[in-house]
Amino acid sequence: MNSISITWNGHSCFTVEKDGFSIVFDPYGPNTVPGLAPLSLTADMVLCSHEHSDHGYTDAVTLKHSGTKNPFSITKIDTWHDPEQGALRGPNRIHILESDGLKIAHMGDIGCPLTREQKDLLKHLDAILIPVGGYYTIDAVQA
């Protein structure tokens, strides 16, 4: 099957699903994102871009332990949450999922320019999940 489902759960939290296998990205904690209800999700895997409570609250996700085979290959790219090489907000990790010729990247709270090598890893994306708020992350022009 060559179909991937992407569901936005609020803030930078997404669920990506293929062939019955689901991955939740960046679950946020209670009261960390104004206006959003607490999360209560179920998935086979959780991936977090960094350890801030609005991106790394893994307690919001119940793992299925279903034994379903992971159809994705996962590439991780270490970046920064700010333009000062992490001095302001620490590290960030980009996750790239690939399956059956489809390629998706979750950028986390990227806050820095990418190197040529990092950009090369992000070529030929079918979907990109990217923040563009401009305060804690890059802005729309930088994106």
What are these regions (language model features)?
Residues 60:
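Short phosphate/oxyanion-binding micro-motifs
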Residues 1-45, 52-54, 64-127, 134-141:
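Core dinuclear metal-dependent hydrolase active-site scaffold
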